[in-house]
A protein has these predicted regions:
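Catalytic phosphate/metal-binding cores of nucleic-acid and nucleotide-processing enzymes, i.e., regions
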Residues: 1-122
């Protein structure tokens, strides 16, 4: 089982089920479709807590490239402006521009990673 930590700004959206995806940097092992995932906030602190019980199941893991001039390439296809907006909203941002600023600041651009989607068992 793979564990993911989330910044506080995303916690309410995850807990109410509005955010059911995450964009992540490459790592040794990501969750795989069909696997249970554990979602936490505050890991490695006294404020650590699990966000969803029972554990959600991974639906998909898709390769992603984010570029400041071209947008997002998902599974070898560049997203339209409308699709960028939908992806940003689903990921917990108010708009595509906010999502782009966040990744530019936190990770730098261009950014290569994965889009992970899950389903809750509520």
């Amino acid at each position: 089982m793979v564990v993911y930590n989330f910044k506080q700004q995303f916690v309410p959206l995850i807990e109410m089920g509005a955010k059911q995806q995450t964009i992540r940097s490459p790592r040794k092992r990501h969750t795989q479709p069909g696997e249970a995932m554990q979602l936490y906030t505050g890991m490695r602190t006294k404020a650590c807590r699990k966000l969803i019980t029972p554990d959600p199941l991974c639906l998909s893991v898709e390769p992603l490239l984010m570029h400041d001039a071209w947008g997002i390439k998902l599974n070898d296809h560049w997203l339209t402006r409308d699709a960028l907006t939908r992806l940003a909203l689903a990921d917990g941002f108010a708009a595509w521009d906010e999502c782009l600023r966040f990744f530019s600041t936190v990770h730098g651009l261009p950014f290569e990673g994965v889009l992970i989607k899950w389903a809750t068992n509520r």
